[in-house]
UniProtKB/Swiss-Prot annotation:
Transmembrane residue ranges: 41-61, 68-88, 97-117
Cytoplasmic side, ranges: 62-67, 118
Signal sequence annotation: 1-18
Cross-referenced InterPro entries: DUF423
Membrane topology classification: Multi-pass membrane protein
Broad class of the protein's primary localization: endoplasmic reticulum
PANTHER family, per the entry: TRANSMEMBRANE PROTEIN 256
Lumenal side: 19-40, 89-96
Family: Belongs to the UPF0382 family.
Keyword Transmembrane helix included in the entry's annotation: yes
Pfam family for this entry, one: DUF423
Name this protein carries in UniProt: UPF0382 membrane protein C1782.12c
Species this protein is from: Schizosaccharomyces pombe (strain 972 / ATCC 24843)
Top-level taxonomy: Eukaryota, Fungi, Dikarya, Ascomycota, Taphrinomycotina
The UniProt record lists the keyword Metal-binding: no
Amino acid sequence: MTIWNVAALTGLLSVGLGAYGSHGLQKRVQDPHLLKSWSTACTYLMFHSLATMAVSLHPVYGKSRWTGPLLITGSCLFSGTIYGLCLLPKGHSLRRILGPLTPIGGLVMLTGWATMLV
């Protein structure tokens, strides 16, 4: 699977999860903060999917072969942990694991962007 395919898959997921957030999530989650977090996760996943697609088409993509994988990994980790935190009930043991992973995903995304500077 190419980086383009992975980016297309994450873009597809962001649209589907965004639709679920708009039409079904309110039946399960009532906290407006969590609903906003879900929306933020969808936005970050979509923007980083598009950025990864653009990077994969860039003629000097090979110069920084880590950019695409870092953007995708970071956005999946960042957004994925937010989705989990929104869906898991308060007090669930996985919440203690997912919470600290969210900013790590953000740092991985930042690293991906930084690789484009060199």
